[in-house]
């Protein structure tokens, strides 16, 4: 359903935080204070952490933290950006939907971007949302369409002349994975729409789910066949749709539940609905199943009553849900309210409290990570929480164990907020028998028996033995993991087996393995061994500097910091020579991060590893940018500090590669056309972004001139001969090619005229005014007044 998945940001700006474009309503005497360095560093670290957890959750289906922990990190970042607005960045998880599309399936752009909803966790937050809505639109109607917030895989199915033609996963909101063949096997998905009034083209958005009873049967079949059990229905649904072998998908009990539409192209006439409830009725007439329990609520109080009633019955429902989605039913009011940069101002996800269960804390085991951090893990008597069997939960550190007062043998309360990773909430002290025992944190590493230390100011205990087998094992696993070099086809279990067996003692050792070496292992046949070696060789020759820096596992250096370093230094030699002062001149790098980088390169063992990597040819250079001078000059780039945006079809390279080249030249990549944009680079059929940039007086550069500028490392002066692109007329662009609009996620097109219909809140489009009636002006999502005029396309929700 909506992209508000289990409290993940991309989707979940807390409702009591003002939306981006309402920032002026929030006043604080300290808004313009100088930003302390520690605040800048903390914001950068939070962004990196949130982006990583977004990727683990949305793309890899392997979350490492609970929703509650994620929400704490997210709200902390929101608070920092509110306290110091200059910290706010368009690439921040608080400003955009996160996540990148996985490799392995064909990728395709959504006609209209799929956005998300803000959320609320209490009645006060629901009331604050309503107050903001009525402040913005005093005469807003009070009826809301409400339905359950399902926990599945969001995607879009497309119909041409009533016939199913394609399907895309949500992906990163702009580009999804093509899963047409898999979706054809979903039994309740109509392959042809019913009725005579079907649109010429329609994009229907919804959620793929597996019912609880079907999930239990699926896992029973998996167990009987000796297969891997699924953690929860969401993971099973997501994995089933992404199968390349559609016979596997066909054997899975998937359902598609429609909740809204994207682009709608009509032959003529007027829009077929003017409310969201009307849209839902029309979807059912066309043959779609819609979320169960959906209903129209006449007032905000009725919405809350619906939320409480549904929450009380959630365990008895056929599918897993974790909240309620409430949307203003009237589409004209929706358009008047508009959007922030991330979400509609007229819709909200009301989240249920975490589900809880009682169980016994049997033991606490301590694990050692790749940086030597000792992490205590609760070993629980297995218990079902939210449809999933829970037997382990991280306790993070010794301080948390003490703060919660946990003892071995305690009965404890465990919760799982729709996530895979559970949390021990508290001990049930009233049930203690006297047989419980205190837990003593080990003074020696459980893997190598070396003394552990707790550095001053830190909560973590660390094993400082660089030869610790656990540290070595986890470091090598990290090196080839998706968070490191991202070696496809080399699984963690194989790496662990190779390390534990003494066959590999460093990351370099993996690259020296031969097919014959690997075939000595049980279940490693000729084909698997060949694929293993091929994958490693492809990673070695195709590695980027960003991925290698990530793979090294330098403390405090996540992917965002790695991108910054890779954009400003030619290779690891140049980075090694940079002193702390030079490093701190780079964005988001403060004394702590700079010190960590210098410490890494001062270690003899690390330097030996780097030389061995160089010897096997794993030594990438910075891509598509001139060599970096030494010292402080290393941060000077032709696009240094400029905000750049690409639009239209690029012919020389793909969009992602072009953005990487711009970053390497010092640019920050923007997500939309705003007054703060410095440069718009246009390819073929640029559409409305070009028109908007011209209105705002933003510099425009053709694709060829942009790449010529990068190659010469010289930024053309203002008013130079860089040609601008003529603006296309409406007649030159068909309904599929006209870019999406800021205030809408549904576009209805018929015979060059527009009508005034409705749609769904879970997706928003880019780059156009909110409404299109003659005569007056309207505010865009960026807060600018744009004259109203004849609409070539109409927006629905």
UniProtKB/Swiss-Prot annotation:
It catalyses: NAD(+) + (deoxyribonucleotide)n-3'-hydroxyl + 5'-phospho-(deoxyribonucleotide)m = (deoxyribonucleotide)n+m + AMP + beta-nicotinamide D-nucleotide. Keywords: DNA damage, DNA repair, DNA replication, Ligase, Magnesium, Manganese, Metal-binding, NAD, Zinc. Residues 1-32, 715-797 are annotated as: Disordered. The active site is at 149 (n6-amp-lysine intermediate). Residues 1-11, 733-750, 785-797 have a biased composition (Basic and acidic residues). This is DNA ligase 2. GO terms for biological process: DNA repair; DNA replication. CDD domains: BRCT_DNA_ligase_like, LIGANc. PANTHER family: CHROMOSOME TRANSMISSION FIDELITY FACTOR 18 (PTHR23389), DNA LIGASE (PTHR23389:SF9). It is an enzyme of class 6 (ligase). It comes from the Bacteria.
């Amino acid at each position: 359903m909506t992209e508000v998945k289990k409290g993940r940001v991309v989707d979940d700006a807390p409702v009591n935080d003002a939306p981006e474009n309402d920032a002026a309503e929030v006043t604080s005497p300290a808004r313009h204070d100088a930003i302390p360095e520690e605040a800048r560093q903390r914001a950068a670290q939070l962004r990196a952490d949130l982006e990583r957890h977004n990727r683990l959750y949305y793309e890899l289906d392997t979350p490492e933290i609970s929703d509650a922990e994620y929400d704490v990190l997210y709200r902390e970042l929101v608070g920092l950006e509110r306290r110091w607005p200059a910290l706010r960045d368009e690439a921040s998880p608080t400003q955009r939907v996160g996540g990148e599309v996985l490799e392995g399936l064909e990728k395709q752009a959504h006609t209209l971007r799929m956005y998300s909803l803000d959320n609320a966790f209490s009645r006060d937050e629901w009331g604050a949302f309503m107050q903001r809505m009525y402040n913005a639109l005093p005469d807003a109607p009070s009826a809301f369409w409400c339905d359950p917030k399902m926990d599945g895989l969001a995607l879009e199915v497309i119909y041409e002349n009533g016939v199913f033609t394609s399907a895309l996963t949500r992906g990163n909101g702009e580009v999804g994975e093509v899963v047409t063949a898999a979706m054809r096997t979903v039994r309740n998905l109509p392959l042809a729409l019913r009725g005579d009034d079907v649109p010429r083209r329609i994009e229907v958005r919804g959620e793929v789910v597996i019912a609880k009873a079907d999930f239990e049967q699926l896992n029973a079949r998996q167990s009987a066949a000796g297969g891997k059990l699924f953690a929860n229905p969401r993971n099973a649904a997501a994995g089933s749709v992404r199968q390349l072998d559609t016979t596997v998908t066909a054997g899975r009990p998937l359902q598609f539940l429609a909740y809204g539409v994207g682009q709608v192209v009509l032959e003529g006439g007027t829009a077929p609905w003017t409310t969201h409830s009307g849209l839902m009725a029309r979807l059912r007439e066309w043959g779609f199943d819609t979320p169960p329990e959906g209903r129209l609520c006449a007032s905000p109080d009725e919405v809350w009553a619906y939320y409480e009633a549904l929450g009380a019955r959630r365990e008895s429902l056929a599918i897993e849900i974790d909240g309620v989605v409430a949307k203003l039913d009237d589409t004209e009011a929706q358009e008047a309210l508009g959007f922030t940069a991330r979400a509609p101002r007229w819709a909200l996800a009301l989240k249920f409290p975490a589900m809880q269960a009682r169980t016994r804390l049997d033991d606490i085991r301590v694990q050692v990570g790749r940086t030597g951090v000792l992490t205590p893990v609760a070993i629980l008597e297995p218990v079902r929480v939210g449809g999933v069997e829970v037997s382990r939960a991280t306790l993070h550190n010794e301080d948390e164990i003490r703060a919660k007062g946990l003892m071995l043998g305690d009965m404890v309360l465990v919760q799982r907020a729709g996530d895979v990773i559970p949390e021990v909430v508290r001990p049930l002290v009233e049930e203690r028998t006297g047989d419980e025992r205190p837990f003593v944190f080990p003074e020696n590493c459980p893997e190598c028996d070396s003394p552990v230390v707790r550095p001053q100011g830190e909560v973590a205990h660390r094993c400082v033995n660089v030869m610790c087998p656990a540290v070595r094992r986890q470091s090598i696993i990290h090196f080839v993991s998706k968070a490191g070099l991202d070696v496809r086809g080399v699984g963690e279990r194989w790496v662990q087996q190779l390390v534990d067996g003494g066959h590999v003692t460093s990351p370099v050792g993996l690259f020296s393995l031969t097919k014959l070496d690997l075939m000595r292992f049980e279940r490693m046949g000729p084909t698997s061994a060949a694929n293993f070696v091929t994958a490693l060789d492809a990673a070695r020759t195709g590695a980027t500097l960003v991925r290698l820096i990530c793979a090294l596992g330098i403390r405090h250096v996540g992917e965002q910091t790695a991108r910054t370093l890779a954009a400003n230094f030619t290779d690891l030699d140049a980075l090694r020579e940079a002193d702390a002062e030079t490093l701190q001149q780079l964005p988001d790098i403060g004394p702590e991060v700079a010190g960590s980088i210098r410490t890494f390169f001062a270690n003899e063992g690390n330097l030996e590893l780097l030389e061995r990597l160089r010897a096997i040819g794993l030594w990438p250079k910075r891509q598509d940018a001139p060599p970096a001078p030494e010292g402080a000059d290393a941060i000077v780039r032709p696009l240094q500090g400029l905000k750049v945006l690409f639009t239209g079809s690029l012919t020389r390279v793909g969009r992602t590669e072009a953005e990487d080249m711009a970053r390497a030249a010092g640019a920050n990549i923007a997500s939309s056309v705003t007054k703060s944009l410095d440069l718009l680079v246009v390819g073929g059929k640029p559409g409305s972004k070009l028109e908007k940039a011209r209105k705002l007086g933003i510099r425009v550069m053709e694709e060829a001139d942009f790449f010529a500028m990068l190659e010469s490392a010289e930024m053309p002066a203002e008013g130079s001969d860089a040609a601008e692109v003529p603006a296309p007329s409406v007649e030159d662009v068909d309904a599929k090619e006209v870019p999406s609009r800021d205030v809408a996620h549904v576009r209805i097109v018929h015979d060059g005229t527009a009508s005034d219909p409705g749609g769904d809140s879970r997706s928003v489009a880019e780059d156009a005014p909110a409404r299109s009636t003659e005569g007056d002006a309207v505010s865009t999502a960026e807060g600018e007044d744009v004259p109203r005029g004849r609409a070539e396309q109409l927006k629905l929700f």
